[in-house]
Amino acid sequence: MQLRKLLLPGLLSVTLLSGCSLFSGEEDVVKMSPLPQVENQFTPTTVWSTSVGNGIGEFYSNLHPVMVDNVVYAADRAGVVKALNADDGKEIWSVNLGEKDGWFSRSSALLSGGVTVAGGHVYIGSEKAEVYALNTSDGTTAWQTKVAGEALSRPVVSDGIVLIHTSNGQLQALNQADGAIKWTVNLDMPSLSLRGESAPATAFGAAIVGGDNGRVSAVLMQQGQMIWQQRISQATGPTEIDRLSDVDTTPVVVNGVVYALAYNGNLTALDLRSGQIMWKRELGSVNDFIVDGDRIYLVDQNDRVLALTTDGGVTLWTQSDLLHRLLTSPVLYNGDLVVGDSEGYLHWINVDDGRFVAQQKVDSSGFLTEPTVADGKLLIQAKDGTVYAITR
């Protein structure tokens, strides 16, 4: 079993485990699969690359670049936020959200949740329980709000509200205009959970979010009223790790169906109105997944890449040659599925049969957060802070 991010009571750092021996007392060594040999059917091209601060190092993070109106916005853990020209990567503006700690130094802002761009603002959260709204024009701070806990997932903006899911199990709604807290919903917390939180999905005036308690919840966005809760993961098993029931992935809502995925639980389809389970499949992950047409694409907790049907979760294909390479969440780009890994490779996979179609060594520091796609470019940020724009 692979566990990448673990939150222990009183421990704020990220713990990387290669097995379960810490909890079971048994040696359980997990080895990374060797790099698969791939005959490239095309050569991906790096259009530009540029540094954004010092990156995230080995810390857990949800920071990844976002492109809006031909501008790329990216951040590092310490507090550097930059706007870049999407054509050539040149800097438009740069700010540092770290507090001054003397004449020539700043303390780290511990940015972790973001980046989200909407309505002329860049939204980003921190492990210091701060949420920032920056003006897209020049990076100046429009507002800054203290929230209930660490903001580890990206802010979600909808209907004039900024939704923040904090590390202590609180879902909070902030006024998009000034950051004032409108309401708080407690989603409950188990004694042990993975480090990270589900970013909410929004549909028909509701926020749908996963919790560390193994439940998916639907909440009215304007009132903060719970509509329904449904358990999709049960805390069972002989070890503490086996009993982790987190739903840290972002639910996907399509045609009145909520698709949700737990770490040790199930891939589950629920009715949006009632929360009733329509079907479930025994699969687990901490990576966000894709619903595209009648297919679901995901990376499971052992780094198998799978394609399944939206009707029942039937497996169409499985790619198992990247086991334990600590893959990013997948992204669809020009008809292929793309994932990054901890050694800095990008892997391009045929969506029809799961075969590799290309492989590219991009960065020596490796990747943790998922690529994003905009305006014909694939954007990805390495752990050392370098942002790459790639085309095929």
UniProtKB/Swiss-Prot annotation:
TM region positions: none
Residues where lipid is bound covalently (N-palmitoyl cysteine): C20
GO cellular component, one term: cell outer membrane
Entries under InterPro entries matching the protein: BamB, PQQ_b-propeller_rpt, PQQ_rpt_dom, Quinoprotein_ADH-like_sf, WD40/YVTN_repeat-like_dom_sf
Main location: membrane
Lipidation (S-diacylglycerol cysteine): C20
Domain of life: Bacteria
PANTHER family, alphabetized: CELL SURFACE PROTEIN, OUTER MEMBRANE PROTEIN ASSEMBLY FACTOR BAMB
Family: Belongs to the BamB family.
Name of the featured protein: Outer membrane protein assembly factor BamB
Organism of origin: Salmonella typhimurium (strain LT2 / SGSC1412 / ATCC 700720)
